């Protein structure tokens, strides 16, 4: 198990991104590896992610985040319960013309995210330390995304005030959450759903895209 970023990690990222159809620039590749280095370093002292082995982080964090990038459009994005920064940090790196907000209620995690912003010079990234229910932005977001955050019922109920009829809600899930879809609030509908294949990851991955009906 490596304690730092290696050439193997760099190659795995390049190959995996190509497999996903994501064309990384040299700068984006470098920034993603810089983010990985910070994640490995800080995870030794803070519990940023349950994935302790750095050799698993490229597939389970970076490539998993990149797998949804083709569904992203430029705009104002919110990553709810961002934790260690997935998928918000990769989103900010791949979409430099978008404004990305990473929100988490855990102070250790938002301190890490702030350090990532400073060290990688991600001027399009905002880090907010708050409970999602208490967060009151000046205007609605174009997109709200979560990865392993909560049930879809909670995700939509807790973020309803952060979007409007034009907002897309993206829920990154493992096994298809058919039971959670049944429990969606009445003013939300499933817009589309997509099975994802993430290089190096075992198990199912799904992306569900929701919209408000009112």
Swiss-Prot record:
First-level EC class: transferase
InterPro entries: rRNA_ssu_MeTfrase_G, SAM-dependent_MTases_sf
EC nos: 2.1.1.170
Keywords: Cytoplasm, Methyltransferase, rRNA processing, S-adenosyl-L-methionine, Transferase
Catalysed reaction, written as an equation: guanosine(527) in 16S rRNA + S-adenosyl-L-methionine = N(7)-methylguanosine(527) in 16S rRNA + S-adenosyl-L-homocysteine
Superkingdom as given in the UniProt entry: Bacteria
Molecular functions (GO terms): rRNA (guanine-N7-)-methyltransferase activity
Record localization: Cytoplasm
Coiled-coil ranges from the UniProt annotation: none
Pfam families documented for this protein: GidB
Cellular component annotations (GO), alphabetically ordered: cytosol
Residues the entry annotates as binding S-adenosyl-L-methionine: 81, 86, 132-133, 147
Record bears the keyword Cytoplasm: yes
Role: Specifically methylates the N7 position of guanine in position 527 of 16S rRNA.
Family that this chain belongs to: Belongs to the methyltransferase superfamily. RNA methyltransferase RsmG family.
Protein name: Ribosomal RNA small subunit methyltransferase G
Organism: Pseudomonas fluorescens (strain Pf0-1)
């Amino acid at each position: 198990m490596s304690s730092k970023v290696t050439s193997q990690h760099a190659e795995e990222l390049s190959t995996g991104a190509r497999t996903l159809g994501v064309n990384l620039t040299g700068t984006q590749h470098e920034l993603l590896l810089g983010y990985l280095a910070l994640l490995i370093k800080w995870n030794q002292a803070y519990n940023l992610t349950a994935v302790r082995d750095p050799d698993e982080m490229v597939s389970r964090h970076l490539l998993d985040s990149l797998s949804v990038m083709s569904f992203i459009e430029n705009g104002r994005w919110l990553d709810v319960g961002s934790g260690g920064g997935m998928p918000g940090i990769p989103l900010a790196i791949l979409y430099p013309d978008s404004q990305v907000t990473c929100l988490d209620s855990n102070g250790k995690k938002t301190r890490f995210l702030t350090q990532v912003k400073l060290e990688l010079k991600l001027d399009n990234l905002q880090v907010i330390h708050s409970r999602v229910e208490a967060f009151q932005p000046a205007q609605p977001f174009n997109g709200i995304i979560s990865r392993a955050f909560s049930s879809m019922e909670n995700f939509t109920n807790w973020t309803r005030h952060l979007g409007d009829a034009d907002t897309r809600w993206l829920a990154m899930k493992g096994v298809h959450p058919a039971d959670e879809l049944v429990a969606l609030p009445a003013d939300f509908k499933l817009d589309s759903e997509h099975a994802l294949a993430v290089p190096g990851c075992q198990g199912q991955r799904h992306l569900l895209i929701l919209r408000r009906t009112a």
